[in-house]
């Protein structure tokens, strides 16, 4: 589903109970609201342009600012306020997934190199 936003547009490409995948086009200077997701990680992959992510950390008073360029990826933890803004016209993908997937591996053995 395609939807307009104040800073561009977003299109949900996949939405189900376990993952969401959105394509966003943000105009240079566009900035989203400061917000948080209670249970979902929020990942950003930049296809084209430049996007600045501000993360308001829960563990300390500083705001982490990361500038992403084409090919870069970063993720914001659940419960952390954040915003993104386009420093240039930007095409990006947002990926959302729940915290419960983080520790979903149970190892029965240890990896090794066979001769």
Annotate the PLM regions:
Residues 29, 48, 89:
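ATP/adenylate-binding site constellation spanning eukaryotic-like Ser/Thr protein kinases
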């Amino acid at each position: 589903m395609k939807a307009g936003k104040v800073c561009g547009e977003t299109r949900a490409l996949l939405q189900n109970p376990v993952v969401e995948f959105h394509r966003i086009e943000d105009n240079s200077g566009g900035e989203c609201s400061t917000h948080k997701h209670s249970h979902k990680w929020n990942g950003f992959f930049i296809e084209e342009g430049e996007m600045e992510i501000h993360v308001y950390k829960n563990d300390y008073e500083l705001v982490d600012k990361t500038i992403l360029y084409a090919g870069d990826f970063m993720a914001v933890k659940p419960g952390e306020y954040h915003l993104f803004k386009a420093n240039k016209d930007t095409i990006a993908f947002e990926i959302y997934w729940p915290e419960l997937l983080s520790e979903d591996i149970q190892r029965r053995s240890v990896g090794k190199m066979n001769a």
